[in-house]
Structures are given as C-alpha cells and as structure tokens.
Amino acid sequence: MEFVYFSNEFPKDDLHDIYRGLHNHSKHRDFPLLARFLNEATAAVKDEVRRLPTELKRLIPPFDNLLSWVENKELREGLLCGAIDGVLLIVAQVASYIGYVESHPEELRNMSEASLAGLGIGLLASTAISLSTEQADLPLAGADAVRLAFRMGVHVFGVSENLEARDLSEKPETWACVVHNVDPAVAQKELDAMQPAGEVPETGKVFISAISRTSVTVSAPPQKLKALLNKCEFFRKARYIELPVYGGLCHAPHIYSAQDTESIVRGASLNARRKGLEPVVPVYSTSSGQPYAAKTATELFECVVSELLRQAICWDKVIAGIVDSAKRTATTEATLHCFGNSIPLNDLDKAFKSDMPELRVSTNNLVPWIFQNEPRDTAPRGPAQSKLAITGISCRFPGGATTTEKFWEILEKGLDVSRKIPADRFDIETHYDPTGKALNKSMTQYMCPIDEPGLFDAPFFNMSPREAQVVDPQMRLALVTAYEALERAGYVGNRTASTKLERIGTYYGQAADDYREVNQGQEVSTYYIPGGCRAFGPGRINYFFKFAGPSYSIDTACSSGLAAIEIACRALWNGDVDTAVTGGMNILTNPDGFAGLNQGHFLSKGHNACKTWDATADGYCRADGIGSLVIKRLEDAEADNDNILGVILGAGTNHSAEAVSITHPHAGHQAYLSRQVLRQAGVDPLDVSYVELHGTGTQAGDFEEMSGIMDVYAPLTKRRSKDQPLHIGAVKSNVGHGESVAGTTALIKVLMMLQKNAIPKHIGIKTEINPKFPKDFKQRNLHIAFEQTAWPQIPGKKRLAAINNFGAAGGNTTMVLEEGPVREKQQADPRQSHVVAVSAKTKASLTGNIERLIAYLEANPATDLADLAYTSTARRYQHTHRVAMATSDVAELTKKLTSSLSKVDSIGPVGKSGPPQVAFSFTGQGASHKSMNLELYRDVPTFREHIHHLDTIAQNQGFPSCIPALDGSFPQDHEHSPVITQLALVCTEMALAKYWASLGVKPDVVIGHSLGEYAAMHVAGVITASDAIFMVGRRAQMLQEKCKIRSHTMMAVRASVAQISESSGGKRHTIACVNGPSDTVLSGTKEQMNEIQVPLEAAGYRCIKLDVAFAFHSEQTDPILDDLEAVLESGVVFQEPKMPYISPLLGKTIFDGKTLNANYVRRATREAVNFLPAMQNAIDIEAVSEETVWVEIGPHPVCAGFIKSIVPSTQLAIPSIRRNEDNWTTMSSSMAALHLTGVALSWNEFHRPFESSLRLLDLPTYAFTEKNYWLQYNGDWCLTKGNTFYSAEKEAARAAEPQPSVGSDLQTSTVQQVIALEVEGNAGVVVMKSDLMQGDLLVAAHGHRMNGCGVVTSSIHADIAYTLGNYLYRKIKPKDKVPAMNMTDLLVTKGLVAQNKTKYPQEFRVTAATPDITSGQIMMSWQNVDDNEPFATATLILGDANDWLSSWESMSHLICSRIDSLERMAAEGKASRFTRNMAYTLFASNLVDYADKYRGMQSVVMSGLEAFADVELTTKESGTWTIAPYFIDSVAHLAGFVMNCSDAMDAAKNYCVTPGWKSMRFAKPLTAGAKYRSYVRMIPTKDDPTVYLGDVYIMQDDEIMGMVGGIQFRSYPRILLNRFFSAPDKAMTEARAGNAATVTPQVTIPKPPSSLKTPAPANPSRRDSGVESKPLPPPQPKQAPPSTDSENSTISKALTLIATEGGLEISDLGDDVSFADLGIDSLLSLVISEKFRSELGVQVSGSLVLDYPRIGDMRRWLEEHY
C-alpha cells in the first residue's frame, strides 16, 4: 500500500533552498505539471489578495511569485502570518509531490489503493492528491488547496483579532502549547476546574486542541494561555513546549461554526468544483480516524476546513484507522511517503511494526530529490525559462583597448587610463575653468577617451566617405563592434534556426548625441538625420546585416547599456527574437556635457578615472566606450556549437522611487531589485562569489550601493561560510564612467574574468576606504581585491557573478550570470585533409587577415586543424577577395599562407556578377573501381543514407545489393558482377550529385559519358532515380545473359579518329568514344584490339586497355538492343530535361522533351560517344563557356581531362573522388577550388556530420582598412550660443516686475513693430517684428528675385540693423549724437524666402541688445517668430566716420589705379564692358533678377574676378528706410555680379551666394540721384576653393566713402537652387502663423562680460560661412585610367559626377562594383539622379541604385540610350 503523510511542519531543510530548487526545476521541460501548479497557486493567491479589504491588502507587498514570501521575514511574522505560512507549507508539499512524480515516473502511478492523511494545514494539502483523478488534475486541485489555506488563514486572523489583538511592535506569541506526559482526561479536568462555567467567557477559555496517548495541545489567546500555564500548578509542573502557532485559534468548536466553514469554502472560486472533480483517494479524518465520506470536491473541502476549525486532533485514531485498513487489505508491503521525518509518522511506523510485524514498511522522503537531482541538461519548458548564452563580445574602450584582450591587459596591470581631454574633442584650454565661474566651461580637464574614434572602414560597411564623415562615430563603432562580436560568435546569417535573419534584433543603449549636437551641427547635411538620430544606431546595424527583427535605441542615462541588454534578454525570454545583438555606446565631443555635469557636482576635478570607494571620492571621470555582445538562448547556442562565454540567469530593472532626489541612489530599491533578480534566476545570494558594482566614485552613490550589496549578498543574518568568499570590484576605477556604456563595460569585464579565472585588483581606493562603509567586511566574508586574485573553476559547481548598474535618472539594472558550460569533444574528426579559407572585401584587408591568421598560428602551433577549417569556413562570412587551401598540417598551412601574401595583388574579387555557371560531368564505367572503399560512405550520414535508399530500390527491383562494392568490405581488386559494378557506379554518381547539391553546388547543365548518361539524365530531371537503377540494372543483366564477359574489350588511344584511321593499317576496329582532339576509345574483340595496338603504338600513340567486362558501343552489345528498347519503352517515363542536356550521342545540346527516350538509350548503348562534338556544340551555342565550372561526378576524374583538352581556357574542372586517394583529400581540394571561383558553398553542411567533434576557435577579427572620418568642432561657439550674457537670476527677478510699455515711436518699411524694449543704465534690448507679406517690405523682397522667388537681400538686413541700432542708441543715450555704425560679422545661415500666398503672414523678429553701450557694441539676431534659433546674426560696432575716411585715404589711389587699368583693358578688348541692360539681363539669367529700383549699375567693366561699376542711385525712394536697401544693393552687388557672371566662374553648373561680410560701413550717406563708383576683386580662399572673399569699395569723386569688407561668396551646385530658394508652402506658413504666439522673445538685458569682444555668431553654418575644418575633406576624383570611354562621353561624365558626389575616386568605379558597396544610398542617389537630369540631360528616376545596382549595369544602359 502507498500512504502519503502531509505534516503541519515545514521540512527541516532550508525553506529558501526548497523553493529555489522547485523554481529551478519548474523551468525545465520535464516538469510541466510542477510549473503549472506554481503558476496556478500564485494566481489563486493573487486573486485572493485582490479581494481583501484595503487595510489587509496593505499588509501584503506586491509579489510575482510565492518565493518572495519565503524571503520576506517581516511578512511571515506579520499579522497575516498564519495565512502566509499556510500557503507556503501547502505549496512546498504539493509542489514537492508533483515534482517527485514527474522525476520518478515509475512511482506513485497507481493511487487507487493509497491512503492520505495530514496534520493541521497539511490535511488541506492532502485534498489535492485525493481529488486528482489523473496527474493533470494536480495543478488545479493543488491551487484550490492553496487558495483555501489563504482564505482560512485570513478568516482565522479576523476572528482571533477580536479575541486578542496583537501588538506589532512586539514579537508574535504562540496560541498553542503541547503538554507532554499528561493524561488527556486529567488535563481536561484541570482546565474545567481553573475555568468554572459562567465565570470565564467561553471565547477566552483555554481548551484542548489536540490529543494523544501521552500529551495534549492546549490553545487560547496568548495572554490567557500564558496566564493559565503560569497560574495552574498542574500545567506548571508538567513539561510543555510552545508551538509556532502565531496566526490565531484553530480546532476550536466554541469559536467557530458551520457558517465559518461555509464562508471559507462556498465563497471561493474553486477549480475542482468547476471541473466536477471527486475524491478518488481516501483522506483520513484527524478527529475520527476514518476516511471522509465526502462525494464531491466541495464536500471534501468543507470536511477538512471544518475539522481544522472545529475539531480536535486525535492522531492515535488516524494510526488505528490506517492499521485496520492495512489489515483488511492483507497487504504485505507499505511505503510511507512524507516530507521529512516527523513524530506522527514515526508513531505510525511503530504501530505497523507492532501490530503487523510481517508487513515490510519503508519510508520515502519526497523532498531530497529537489537537491539530489539538480536541473538536468534538458531543454527548458519554453523561452521564458531559458538561460541565455553570451556567444560573442567586442569592444572599443579607453586606453587603447581595441580588443577584449587589450582591455584585460588594462585590468590586469591595474591601469588608470584617464588623461587630458584630447584636442579632437574640443580645445580644453578655452573650455576649462577650474573655478566654475565662467559660463559653460568645464571644471575638469580629464576624461578616459577612446583613441581615434573616427577610424572606420567606410567601404566595408557600404558607406560613402561623405556619409561616413557625418555618421556619429559611436554608431559607426557600434556597427564595427557588432560585426566583430558576431564574427567571434561564429555568426553566419541563416546558418541555423536561431540565426534566421527575421529572428535577430538589435538593442543598444545611448544617452547622448554629442556628435550630432556639436560636430554635425556645424554643417547640417543630407546625412544629418540618419547619421545622428539615435534610432539609426541599432537601425543601421539591422540594415547592414539585413536583420529583420526589432531594433531599439534605449536611453536610461548611465544604465542605458545594461538596460538595453536586459531588454534584449526580455526579447529572448519572450520569444520575440532568437538572437540579440546588444550593447552600449558613448563618444564624448560636446563640452556642454562636461560643463553641465560639473555644475551638477557629478564629476571629479582630478586626474584620475574614478576613486571608487575612496574616502576622498569626489565624483566620476567621463569616458568613451563601445561594447557589443551577441546573446542567444542557451539551448540554441549549444545546438549551434557556439562558444559560450557566460550564461545570463536573470536580469531586471526598477526605479529608485523613494530616493531623496531623482539623481540620488537608494539602497533599498537596489537591494529589492537584486533579490528579485536572484529569485527569478533561482540563485542563492550566498552562492554568488563576485559582484561588479556600479562604483562611480561619488560619496552618495558608493555608500548607498555598498549598503544594498552587503544587505543582499553578505548579510549578517545568514552569514557566508568560510568557503563562500564574496569579492567586489568596479571597472570605473580603471576606464572611467562610460555613462551609457558603463553596464556593458562591466559585463564584458566579468566575462573576461571568467575566461581568465582571475579577479583584477581594484585601484579606486587612492587614500583609504570610505569611512562610512561598515567595518565588518571580514565578518561578512566580503573582500576587495587589492591584488589580482585567483577565481578558479570549482569541479561540479559553477561560478556565479552579479552586475549592478544604475542610471542618474533613477533607474537600477541588475544582472546575474554564471560561467558557461564546459563541453568536451565526443571524438576526433576523421577527415585527413581540411580547407582553410581567408577572405576580405579588399586586397588590403585580405593581406591583413592573412597576416593576423599567420600570427595566430605561430602563437598557437597546437591549433586543431579541423577546428580551424570549421571556424574559417562554416563560421565566418566569406567575402569576395579570397584565399583558400586544402591542407593536412598546420605547419604546412602556415607556409602556404605566408606564400599567399605575395599573390594578394593578383587576386581579384569573385562573384561580383553572381556565382559562376556550374556543369556536372558524369563519368562512365571506364573509371570505376572494382571495389570502392568510400570514406564519404563511412563518414557522411546523409550520403550513406541516400546510398541505402538507392540500394533498397535496386533490391526491390530484384537486383543484388551494390553496398559491398562501396563500403570497403571487399579488397579493392575484388571483381564483382557487372550488375553490381554498374549499379554501384550509377548509385554512387546519383548520391554524389545529391551530396554536392546539399553543399550548395547544383548544376546548370549536365553531360554524361557512356554509363554516366543515366545519372546525368536523372539529375537533369529526365528520369527518376528508380528508373535509372532499373535501366542500368536490366541492361547489365541482359549483357550478362547474352554477351560473353571479357570476350571483348575497349582501348583508349591518345590520338584523333583521323590519326587512328591513318595509322591502323586497316585493322578492324570500332570507334567507341571520341573524347577529345587526341582522345579516342576503340572497341572490339580482344584479338582485334591486340592487333590494332601494334601499329598505333609503332606510330607513337599511347594505348591503354580498359578494365571492362564488355566492349560497350560496339557490335558486342547488338544482342540486347531490341529487348532493351522494348523494356524501356514500356517501363520508363522520360520527361523534358530541366536544364540543358549535352548529348554525347548526338553531339549536340538537348532542350526538348522528345529526344531522350528508349530509342535514345538503345542508340547510346551501341553507338559512339561523341563527347568532343557534343562539347564543341555546347560551346558554340553558349550552353557552356570557358567560365563554366566543371564538377566531375564519378569514382575517378576522366571527363575533366577531356574538357580541358577541348576548352584549354576552362576556368575549373574538378573531381569528386579520385582513385587511390582519400575522399576527403579530393573533396577538400575541390571545395577550395570551387570557393575561389565564387560558388556559394554550404560550408555548414560540409562540416555538419562532424560538428560534435569540432569547436569554434576565437580567431583574430577582420582587419579593417580604416581611415579617420571626423568632423572637428571648431572654435568655442558652445561657450556663447548667442546667450553669453544671459542671467537666470536677473530674468527671474525681472519676471516679477511690471513690464515696461513699448512705445510706438519707431515704424519703418522694414521695422514694422517694436514688440519689446527695455533699458537699464547703459544696457538695453529692443525686439521688433515685421511681416514680410506687408507693404514696402514685400516689394523690396520681390525686387530681388532668385529662382523665381522673392528673397530678402542682405541689404534689407542691413537697413534693419542700422534702424534698430540708431533707435536703441537714442533710447540709452537720448542726449548724445548717434555715432556712425559698422555692421560687422553678418552671417545669414538661411535665406528668408517670401512665400507665394500673401494672405498668410510671414513674420520674423530681430533683436538688438547691448550689455553696455559704452563698449561700442550692439548684438543683432534674426529669428522666425516660431523659432528661437537665429537664421542671421551680426554685431554693430560704433565708430567715427571721419576716422574711417582717414583710414581709406591711402587706399584711394590704389583703387583708382586699378579702375584706370580696367578701363584700358576694356579699350584694348582685354576686359568686358557691360551696359546697364546687358549687365542686369545677364545677372537675371544667371541668378538674380533685380527690380528697376535696384538697378543702380549704369555700366560694368570686368576682367576675371575684378570689376568696377559706375552707379547712379534711383531718384525715388519708395518706403521709409534708414538706408534704403535699393541703395545699399546698387553700390555693393557688383561682387555678386562678378561671382555669377564672370567667365572665370562656371555659372552653368554653379551659382554663388553670400552668407555675409566682415564689415559694412558708410562714412557718408547714400543719396538719391547721386553717382558712385564701386570696385571689387574676389579671390578664392586657401582652405576651400568654393569660398571666395573680397572687399567692395564705394567711391564718390575718387574718394572712398563706404566699404563692404570681407564679403564672402560660396559656390553651390546649381542643382541645389530649388532646395535653398523655393517659396515655403501654405502648410508651413499656417503652421508658422499658428505657432507664432507660443514663442516669446527673450528681452533680458545682457550682462556685461569681463572682457568684451566681438562674439562669434551663434551656431554658424559651415556650409554658408566657408569655415570648415575637416581632417578628411571629400577627395576630388582622380583621373580615370585609360578606358574606352572618351573624356567627353556621357559615360565618362556620369562616372565623374558619381565620384564627385560620393567623395570617391574614378578608379573605384569598376563595372562589377555595386552602388551599395560604394555606400551610395537612396539619399545620395536622389542627388546624383537630379544632376544626371540637369547636367547631363540623362533622364533617370530617383531610384537609380535600384534600377541599375552595379556600375556596369548603369554603363550598359547609358551606352544603349545615350
């Protein structure tokens, strides 16, 4: 009999360990019922908690599983402790029972004769087994028991609370005591005497709740119970023990009624009731000792709950009842199942032995299996239960850590790699202020930078140089490290189920956009958005690798990297992806970040990384960093034969919600997260031997984190044993705080520690340890490694580590991982020869890859060659530049690799035009072995299985097995029957063809030689494999039956048919095969062959007799022909070939479905094999070519020689098998040769049969050909930003003051409304607003038309500046005369173009401000009303007009002499003279169409880029102006005329516009009707030939009266005219008008700086300013090499245009090169397409790169159409 006892006590084992073990087992596929029960039990309790009153609900914190209750001591000792422990006990017992049944499937199967019993709450657990008709019912019935236990516990608490309320500040007191060695009747009599009826309330009486022969349990409210025990002499003298009963009274009939039972059971939502479950196993009542008579689940539950509430326990009755039952059944064996040893079970065991001595009784504990059977290496239950394997890592970390090995060297040596901020980020000399008083400056000079972060291989990643320069370097390096991590992980797309492109996602952490904000922002270009916005980082990785899974960019501040990894883990656990590429990125270039973090007191000012845990820790040191990892589910990684660097067991993120501020850490929340992650991972915190801390080196952060870590991993309550030391470390002390990459850096550090079996020394403590830390490190067994410490592997146990990572925004992320599994090879790879391949995208990288591999082999001479071959072929991407070699020895390989270095320059790319054509040639019988011993048959299961399938077909058709001729069971010279020999040949060839197909080698055309035609017809789809076997077998049988074996023979002669005829001397013979120009086979009788051999050899022709049984293709076969044709006619169906079929019978290529038939086979048996004419025909009709790759299918290469003799220039002809050579030697050589031709081989399939014997090697990563692509941040504009004098304090104070009213005393044509004015002492600010669509201003704009649009000319800006400058000066100095004003440093970053629809306003505002008018400066800025970003800036410098005139006097003579010179040149015809109409007509046709009011130039003389003009200003001034724009333009736009109309400029392709000037000043007013003379000479700048500078001198009566100095023009491709000068549409206008009210102009009076100087314009556009600092400017295309394209051809021009736009060289534009390889994407394609149309007249769509993906495609299209 089976008896299961459910105790009312927890097992003696640690409850944490029990629950943790159950949790871990539930993750595995072998325990589905256990997992379901735990889920159902948790759901049931959550449902009950949800239903609780609010005051009780508050007592239970949120939980995700019941394991958290075990760890919550406060909860288990709280008010609801009875309910909590009741649930935990039932869950432990039912889960242990279910898990035991699942792990011991042979036990506890038949419970029909079993019995159940329990004590206390254990009785409720027994109902789960009783109600389970089948094991599948256990989870639901068990969840019901858990639900009722909770409900009953809550109910008991509610009742008991009314009897005696508990003081939570005190320890809980017991409600029950067991009194030993007393008679129950005497005990009851004593209780009655002490509690007379009517004198003591019934509800307060002490009562007996359990009875045994020698003891009683007495229960009562704690104080009543304590008082009686102390008061009553009887109980005081007896020995009593307090029981751990703290939840209230049970077994109390005077307290509870049937209504209580009904409330608990009937009010519950029960699965058993819903499913109609009934008791099937008897449960013994602890009051009657008999099984309950319940018929339904509800009745059983009510019986049990009623007994627990109202009936006293009498275990002796249970024992008697069970013994009686055993006696009645006459059982001979009894197994007592329990959950740990207990007194009641021992009593039952004694009773059995006493009353039934013949009964064999055994005890079985259902708990130990949890610990004895650690989770087996079985698949997890689902993705959510999987462990996650890290299979590849790569990094770019500070200190030159470009590899993980170099990173480890930094850690191992204990280096601090902080240094002065490098110049490629910003000029620290101008951006540093140790006092912190200077605006926007950093108080630290130090960081931990990556060396040369701009290094990048743009062509490899299909980026043009122009795009690469713009793309954020952290995105570029994320792409590079992702490639390296995948490469080290052995990733090849679609190789396995887990590497399907649709199932791979990317997840990267990034918290800053420095490069976009500062470097890119200086010149916004086509790639500004895709090159800088964060989403494009992971998106670019997906796009490059063609991953179709999700891509996420994660920003959680400093925890971004690890949070991204955690989200990647979630995706794997959720089943969203099968492989995740993840990590973090951070490249620092923006000085604002340093200034802001300094102001927030985050950064250390010293020259150190991070002083983590140091007493003087004062903040962190900022750091660069890029880290990438590849993560899979563990079972997938193991199935894929990956290297497993570490295994992630759990990860989670939460928020420090209760912290004192958002940036302040919180130890409690950190500890909570750690416990939660450990619980989910099923890990005991004390088993974790290393924790990598965040450790930024801030006082607050270090203390809070250390407190949380100690609380969880090294607590005082449950201390670590001596053999459980815990070490802690923090990588930031070495490489600084990488912010968004910090967690990634920490994870990679831990992975390297696992690999190196060492804990590197901690270098953060520079003085002494933080005094706030607890002093009991030693007692806690907690250690900081001050020297490198061994971290050895422990047999039978895995090392565990945790990583803490926090974010300044309040986020906490924690991860727990263990070391990867150790995998041993099952057996050695049997192959003797292997292929090692090295490839790259360029020759330079190929050289680098070869050199790296040579260095690796020299450093690792014991490298397993099989592993190397596997890694370099099946586990690496194969690029277009290749070397591959078959070898059997590493030393030999090293020599071959070294030799190949000298040949790299001669190696061209393969596969650029697609893979080569493949042809299969099938060998005839002349090459077959008598008895083959095929290693392929021995070693390749798929080949062997296919041979067996074919052999089965043959035997089913009545033929003998051909296996003995293949498997080596006979000596090679053993001669089999013709049937076996011929079947062996055809089966081998069909199996070889299928094997080649599995390797990716499939024929495009076939030819068969003699008997090889049957296999060829099968592969071509003409006949089935079954028919091929039938045809060959029947033909062989007929030959055997009707022809005499060995009476005839065949002889190969190295001569042509004509030569044989000429030299045979008339000897009789039959031409059997014409194989080549000098290869012929004769057939005949042996005598005939002997006779003809003599003259042929005498003539010098080599003759070889073939070892064949019959003379095929001769008269010997005549007897079988009729029968053969008849049999095939009726038994074989011939289909149309699926590929060209080269017929050696007909000497031509067959495409139709009629030629190949039974008659064809008859003729092919008898007639000659015309291999030579067949091949010649195939060449003639281009069915094959010299580029065709030939694979010979047969036991020995024969046809390959014929093919090469017919087509000597054949690229490749290789064998499958070679006689007397190991198959793998032949296959390796052939595979290597095929690989070098570009055939897409399935290397994975090639190695798959041996993968258990192979391991992935960590070979050197790809040798990128890197260049430095970097946009340098220039100047110090980050310090100014146009708000240099902004004062937050003043702004706040002024906001509370009444705003001054703005007077309306200023209104001109350009300054329509003053909207803000404030003056304070010598400081002031004025803001105006004007509508471009109004009045004279609109007329002025439309008088200056470009591209058909009205454009606000710079002269309008000048009038506004002079107007506001005069106005502001008068307001500040009303009594002073307004001085002359020099408008300096005008910079227009974006033209203001008038919209077409004038009914909508187009408003802009201009601000003029000065901190101190005595400084002589007024700052100007122009903005649209809906945008605070200025589109123009300038500075007015106050001056003296007389001083200007004096300074110009010396120049007047020089200018006049140049004008005289131009006059002479014009007179001599050496300079051009233009009239007014000619000049403005030309100006209008080239760029600017001026209205008549602007047309002041009356004549122009121009030579090259030098000119003068006679100017007369219009006599009518329409509008109100300070200086009319018509006047300014008339005297100044000579410079624009020169730049756009001079023959020295290419006006057809380009146009020139001015972004501004250095100065504009007029010493005298410009007067209507007055005459002036303007002179200018423009010169190109040295730094940028597209930028020109010049000075425009304005003269009156030979005296300089005005000057526009340093006027700048920049040349742009005319194709961009539409982009920059197009009227804004209505939608934009409406949006601007609608948003105008939301933007409030700042009118804060500027604060005077300590030293006033002309400020740099805010955020200048480098495109317009001409100020560029690019280490790698786009290269100009070099002269193309000699080609068939003439210089003036459309093709040549098109290539030049492409090279120019892509920043490429023409030599890069080979026909086989794709646009994608050049990095020309859709954006650049649009620009190129537009230029094709406008400059070349070539009409192409914007999808150029899609329509013509390769240069050659585009060239051919141009040749055809242009």
Curated annotation (Swiss-Prot):
Protein name in UniProt: Non-reducing polyketide synthase PKS8-1
Pathway: Secondary metabolite biosynthesis
Catalytic residues of the enzyme: C558, H694, H737, H1344, D1529
Reactions listed under catalytic activity: holo-[ACP] + 8 malonyl-CoA + 8 H(+) = atrochrysone carboxyl-[ACP] + 8 CO2 + 8 CoA + 2 H2O
Molecular function (Gene Ontology), one example: phosphopantetheine binding
Domain Carrier: 1685-1762
Domain notes: Multidomain protein; including a starter unit:ACP transacylase (SAT) that selects the starter unit; a ketosynthase (KS) that catalyzes repeated decarboxylative condensation to elongate the polyketide backbone; a malonyl-CoA:ACP transacylase (MAT) that selects and transfers the extender unit malonyl-CoA; a product template (PT) domain that controls the immediate cyclization regioselectivity of the reactive polyketide backbone; and an acyl-carrier protein (ACP) that serves as the tether of the growing and completed polyketide via its phosphopantetheinyl arm.
Induction or repression: Expression is positively regulated by the cluster-specific transcription factor MYCFIDRAFT_198930 and is up-regulated as early as 2 weeks post-inoculation and remains high through 9 weeks.
Chain residue ranges for the region called Disordered: 1632-1689
Organism: Pseudocercospora fijiensis (strain CIRAD86)
PROSITE patterns, alphabetized: CARRIER (PS50075), KS3_1 (PS00606), KS3_2 (PS52004), PKS_MFAS_DH (PS52019)
Keyword line: Multifunctional enzyme, Phosphopantetheine, Phosphoprotein, Transferase
Modified residues (O-(pantetheine 4'-phosphoryl)serine): S1722
Region span, C-terminal hotdog fold: 1471-1618
GO biological process: fatty acid biosynthetic process; secondary metabolite biosynthetic process
Enzyme Commission numbers on file: 2.3.1.-
